[in-house]
Amino acid sequence: MRIAVSSDMDEPVARLVVDELRRRGHTVVAYGALRAGDREDWAWSAENAARQVAEGRADQAVVCCWTGTGASIAANKVPGVRAALCADAYSADGARKWNDANALALSLRLTSGPLLREILDAWFAGAPSDEDDDRANVAHLEEIR
């Protein structure tokens, strides 16, 4: 899977996201503080990663900032992107299952190495629900303007 990763800070957990995704066999394209010459600010770096998903150049994105909130807000401004700020495995599983999330937002402050691995395990194990009400909710997101 091709995954766009952004961070507004070159923090150890941001590097761990990249390393862990690569260890799992994914191709990583980095943005923001993780890519020399990129604008590092959370709004710009998260937008760049999210656009990769929206334009079909990446399958998913992981967007990071200190709290994860700004990165998730910026990513969700990109049409077609459904970013979920996840601080635990249960939220990551639910975001994939019920919301068909295609961008994972993470807090650089709160996410430890072991927690990151749990979140990624749940994220990649999760699959979008086939339930009619879940599909209807996700479809309705495209209608909201």
Where would I find each of the regions flagged by the language model?
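Short amphipathic alpha-helical segments
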Residues: 17-19, 73-77, 117-118
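A short beta-strand-loop structural module common to alpha/beta enzyme folds
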Residues: 27-38
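Short, structured active-site "lid" loops
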Residues: 42-64
